[in-house]
Amino acid sequence: MALLAEHLLKPLPADRQIETGPFLEAVAHLPPFFDCLGSPVFTPIKADISGNITKIKAVYDTDPAKFKTLQNILEVEKGMYGAEWPKVGATLALLWLKRGLRFIQVFLQSICDGERDENHPNLIRVNANKAYEMALKKYHGWLVQKIFKAALYAAPYKSDFLKALSKGQNVTEEECLEKIRLFLVNYTATIDAIYDMYTKMNAELDYTV
């Protein structure tokens, strides 16, 4: 669980504003999560998350004060790009980043909730499929969906996944799950706040890739 426990997200303030710098610093450590899934077919999601973090950081670094929060980024870019917004800039990068982060959240929550294939309880295919269905599938065309369906069958055993997530540390499954639950508290609240922000600002897009 070391991979997640070392980089917990900050609790949200009352106004649910997410500070850009600390957010990017925390999520920058998440792409290796996909290495724990074993299959190289998950590499595109990993690369997508890394690439979108880089794009948002490039905008943030131009003026950290102006782009102090994620909402600041959307508001400034809305005024800057006009009719092209929200399909441009860091707004578009964050749109896709939140989907990749939601995949991780739904997947981990499903494992913590004990959802599984009763005939194959040590497989994480059920969890990965739920995460894909909820976070990414509707934004993928037929070909990409087919590729990911194949990837789900290559997902590792739960025991191997948790061991990889723990970076080889000798911890029990329950200890690992407890650390995942701790990680998910602020992580889930943050992802929910980003989704709500996109809805309120009418910045959500439904096109497929």
UniProtKB/Swiss-Prot annotation:
GO biological process: intermembrane lipid transfer; response to immobilization stress
Intrachain disulfide bonds: none
Subcellular localization: Cytoplasm
Keyword entries, A-Z: Acetylation, Cytoplasm, Lipid transport, Repeat, Transport
Cytoplasm recorded as keyword: yes
Modified residues (N-acetylalanine): A2
Amino acids binding beta-D-galactosyl-(1->4)-beta-D-glucosyl-(1<->1)-N-[(9Z)-octadecenoyl]-sphing-4-enine: D48, I49, S50, G51, N52, I53, T54, K55, H140, Y207
Principal subcellular localisation of the protein: cytoplasm
One cellular component (GO) term of this entry: cytosol
GO molecular function, one term: identical protein binding
Pfam entry (one): GLTP
Region (2 X 12 AA approximate tandem repeats): 45-66
InterPro entries reported in the protein's UniProt record: GLTP_sf (IPR036497), Glycolipid_transfer_prot_dom (IPR014830)
Mapped Sequence repeat ranges: 45-55, 56-66
Keyword Transport on entry: yes
PANTHER family, per the entry: GLYCOLIPID TRANSFER PROTEIN (PTHR10219:SF97), GLYCOLIPID TRANSFER PROTEIN-RELATED (PTHR10219)
Family: Belongs to the GLTP family.
Task performed by this protein: Accelerates the intermembrane transfer of various glycolipids. Catalyzes the transfer of various glycosphingolipids between membranes but does not catalyze the transfer of phospholipids. May be involved in the intracellular translocation of glucosylceramides.
Quaternary context: Monomer.
Name of the molecule in the record: Glycolipid transfer protein
Organism phylogeny: Eukaryota, Metazoa, Chordata, Craniata, Vertebrata
GN (gene name): Gltp
